[in-house]
Amino acid sequence: MVASKYAKRDLMQSEFTERANGLATHGVGLSVDVYSPDLLHLVHSLREAGLQPGYLEVFKATTSAMQWVRRHLPDMKLPYHGEGLWVTQPDFPRGSSGTQGVAEACAQILALRSAWLNHECAMKQMVGYSFGTYLPPLYTELSARMTAENLAFLQEQVDEQARRHGTDPALVLLEMPPLTYFGCGSLAIPAFFRAVTDRVACGLVLDIGHLWTVYRYTGAWLRQTLEAFAAEFLDAFPMERVIEIHVAGLAEFTAQGGAQYMVDAEALPYWIDAHGAPIQ
């Protein structure tokens, strides 16, 4: 059993390496929305300022919108940021997320000619409830196994779409989510992602802002410096799978009453995901 576990891990790493080696270098890019800000206006403004991003990671829209983007940006690398593909949930392959959602994602990947499909390791909906923000997975061994199985299913669907159309398949990437309201489970976050990557040949996205939320909201800031926390976390995280690093996207949240929400006068600010913030 132990030998089988390590053989599986080595096989997944080998498959990932083969897929990753087929990706073109993308350089430094932006994660963008088609509509807000207007994507073509943004690109024009950047070019006027003498800035040329290596790529634009486009958030889910409609397939026709993605086709429009590709027509207007024929030479730009356009990887895809999916939404609504709740791979952390046990019913993913059978529910609308894994059927209609995956079909839409595959069509949009095809329209953009994306090198990868990035998705948060999180969900916003459960048994009919919508939370309006990302909730992290259960950080347990069972949850890691189920997430890996769902990622393998998703990659199979992406591969099948590529075969039908004679294109290169996009690589599925799993993004480390923010710590929002709470986190549950017995596994440390790096150990969870290690358990996932031992079982599936996916890539990872490391979001530095999301890493900061873990430091802030687990209370690690009370025990460690940020530098010590980050070094320990990244040493355990499967960095060999990281394809993309996100380095922006947080804004300080100011609650009414201010100091009453702080643990003490030295508490760090409340930072949250702020995808609507202006690009500066």
PLM feature segments, named:
Residues 42-45, 70, 182-199, 215-227:
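Distinct, well-ordered alpha-helical segments
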Residues 40, 90, 127-129, 184, ...:
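Short acidic, gly/pro-rich beta-turn/loop elements at beta-sheet edges
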